[in-house]
Regions:
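Loop/turn-to-beta-strand initiation segments
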Residues: 91-93, 116-123
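Conserved catalytic/switch belt of AAA+ P-loop NTPases
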Residues: 110-115
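Conserved ATPase-coupling elements of RecA-like P-loop NTPase cores
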Residues: 99-109, 129-134
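Conserved P-loop
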Residues: 2-88, 128-139, 149-152, 173-174, ...
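Walker B catalytic acidic pair
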Residues: 98, 124
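Conserved AAA+ ATPase core "coupling" helix
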Residues: 151-172
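Short basic (Lys/Arg) and small-residue
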Residues: 144
Length: 210
């Protein structure tokens, strides 16, 4: 029995070049899934180039590293156009971890790479700590052929977690706090919709269910 991902992959292989997005909250295994796909392609002798934003230096500066400490070598890039220093005509696969930390020009770049026959695999947060769409991620997901949305486990109740809880001095962050703040388990948690808290977050709608 084939998964829907495997079926789509077989169909896409008939034509070279497409975009895959792996998204979800922190601790959902996004980097782990990206590394799994990269490792499978390495076994197939594909020519792969892996990138991550220089901003993300939590575990290593020249490797993509998951929370489980699985890793692969990567290039740090400060700007999206830096990928062209390393991607060549004979590159088969381009993988980018934590793509949400790059500038928005990465959208046009990865579309160009896919049009040029590259398989592009990216991972990133689909929402920020406020549970709002993260930067250009909605546009990226709309342009991709394959979108894999992962969930974590809520640290409070054990339900499927779709949100990233930012903790500051032991308390939930405020809505107007900076969006980008690199951290790991000491500053973020996975939470479900009902356990996720943001101080002073505007309520978009006040209903009156009866």
């Amino acid at each position: 029995m084939y998964t829907i991902y495997e079926v789509i992959h077989v169909v896409l292989k008939q034509k070279e070049g497409w975009i895959e997005v792996i998204c979800g909250p922190m601790f959902a295994g996004k980097t782990e899934e990206l590394l799994r796909r990269v490792k499978r392609l390495e076994y197939a002798k594909a020519n792969i180039v892996v990138f991550k934003p220089a901003l993300d230096d939590r575990y290593a500066t020249s490797e993509v590293v998951s929370h489980n400490q699985n890793r692969t070598e990567s290039y740090n890039i400060h700007e999206s156009h830096d990928v062209f220093k390393y991607v060549k005509k004979d590159t088969d696969v381009v993988a980018i971890d934590e793509i949400q930390f790059l500038d928005e020009s990465i959208l046009e770049i990865i579309e160009y790479l896919a049009d040029e026959g590259k398989r592009v695999i990216v991972s990133g947060l689909d929402t920020d700590f406020r549970a709002e769409p993260f930067s250009f991620m909605p546009k990226l997901m709309a342009k991709a052929e394959i979108v894999t949305k992962l969930t974590a486990v809520c640290v409070k109740c054990g339900a499927p977690a779709t949100r990233t809880q930012r903790i500051v001095d032991g308390k939930p962050a405020k809505y107007l706090d900076p969006i980008v703040l690199i951290g790991a388990s000491e500053s973020y948690e996975a939470r479900c919709r009902h356990c996720h808290k943001v101080y002073r977050k505007p309520k978009p709608y006040q209903g009156n269910l009866r």
